[in-house]
């Protein structure tokens, strides 16, 4: 009788262990499967800087979608957002820093382009302080573009253009976003090599 009880107890214990082990194994598998699934969902966006891969925080808004809610700081240190650009077509010329040759060239080129556009504002956007942006445009005599800084706003995160790795981590990638007077995205370009200039023609054609 005692032996029978002992056997029953041992069987119960073994069964318990087996269930526990099986549950643990299944749980581990489920966690692993979920992690794998999630890693597939989040595909990293990358560009290059001098041929070296660097990560970008997200993806540009889709053509046809509404421009995400954003904020930028102007030369007077006031903030602007979606409501401030409503009613005008806008080209956002986005880049790392006004103090680099390619960024300076793109600002000059878009200044020239802006002179021939109607009902269109061209914003040159970087993480530079507004004073640096204003100083550059003032010394170069660039009066057709507007400058705006992302240094204390959500702009980079909202549009998915923050550089998240590499030597320029923390500033913006090189990109162009064009929107119509109602805030609908007409064209986007994430320049694959930061040292290269954007496709100016594609930006202009999006407004035709």
Q: Which residues make up each language-model segment?
A:
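Chalcogenol-based redox active-site neighborhoods
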Residues: 2-4, 25-208
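Primarily low-complexity, compositionally biased regions used by nucleic-acid-associated proteins
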Residues: 1-11, 15, 19
């Amino acid at each position: 009788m005692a032996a029978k009880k002992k056997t029953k107890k041992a069987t119960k214990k073994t069964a318990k262990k087996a269930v526990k082990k099986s549950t643990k194994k299944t749980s581990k598998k489920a966690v692993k499967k979920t992690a794998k699934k999630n890693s597939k969902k989040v595909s990293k966006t990358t560009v290059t800087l001098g041929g070296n891969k660097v990560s970008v925080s997200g993806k540009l808004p889709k053509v046809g979608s509404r421009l995400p809610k954003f904020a930028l700081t102007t030369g007077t240190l006031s903030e602007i957002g979606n409501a401030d650009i409503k009613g005008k077509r806008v080209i956002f010329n986005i880049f790392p820093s006004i103090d680099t040759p390619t960024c300076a060239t793109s600002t000059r080129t878009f200044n020239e382009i802006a002179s021939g556009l109607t009902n269109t504002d061209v914003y040159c956007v970087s993480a530079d302080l507004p004073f640096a942006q204003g100083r550059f445009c003032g010394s170069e005599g660039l009066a057709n573009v507007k400058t705006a800084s992302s240094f204390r706003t959500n702009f980079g995160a909202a549009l998915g253009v923050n550089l998240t790795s590499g030597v320029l981590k923390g500033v913006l990638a090189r990109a162009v976003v064009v929107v119509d007077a109602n805030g609908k995205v007409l064209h986007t370009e994430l320049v694959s090599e930061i040292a290269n200039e954007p496709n100016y023609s594609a930006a202009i054609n999006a407004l035709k």
